[in-house]
Amino acid sequence: MSDYELDPLPYEYDALEPHISEQVLTWHHDTHHQGYVNGWNAAEETLAENREAGEFGSSAGALRNVTHNGSGHILHDLFWQNMSPEGGDEPEGALAERIAEDFGSYEAWKGEFEAAAGAAGGWALLVYDSFSNQLRNVVVDKHDQGALWGSHPILALDVWEHSYYHDYGPARGDFVSAFFEVVDWDEPAARYEQAVELFE
């Protein structure tokens, strides 16, 4: 059985200020993200024990917890990696070209992504859809509701209230704008290249 662990942030807790405060990053990473790691491990342990005992009364709940907490852990890892204090630029190279091809322009992609972020009850994601071989924005509620089967996440924005309420109150749009001041396209570009290698 895998034992999942919380990796350190790839920068200091105050590195994204003034856009995302040290307090929010500390709470978000050390408490919320850690909770998803703990929940995933606990669910896997329950499943392993049930298989060993041949008793499956609690397995359905544990399976749901694997999906919820596992997706939460994976998306948070991606979220931390696609921000940096050196961020704030637009994508370049192959990913920029593909965004323009699939959405018409970077501005059209960004407008649609911001709309997704405003509507989501969890995450706005830019994904590579391996079924149709194109980039898409998707609205994900919680961590696992609304995801598109066969899609490969490229860019993730967490819009759960714990991501922004301390800094921005109910003004989620201000937080989304702040995200674009720290978004670092190096990791999304690498994930896009990985998707192309896998699926095209």
From Swiss-Prot:
Gene3D superfamilies: Fe,Mn superoxide dismutase (SOD) domain, Iron/manganese superoxide dismutase, C-terminal domain. Destroys superoxide anion radicals which are normally produced within the cells and which are toxic to biological systems. Pfam families: Sod_Fe_C, Sod_Fe_N. It comes from Haloferax volcanii (strain ATCC 29605 / DSM 3757 / JCM 8879 / NBRC 14742 / NCIMB 2012 / VKM B-1768 / DS2). Keywords: Manganese, Metal-binding, Oxidoreductase, Plasmid. It comes from the Archaea. The keyword Lipoprotein does not apply. The gene is sod1. This is Superoxide dismutase [Mn] 1. NCBIfam families: Superox_dis_Halo. One of its GO terms (molecular function) is superoxide dismutase activity.
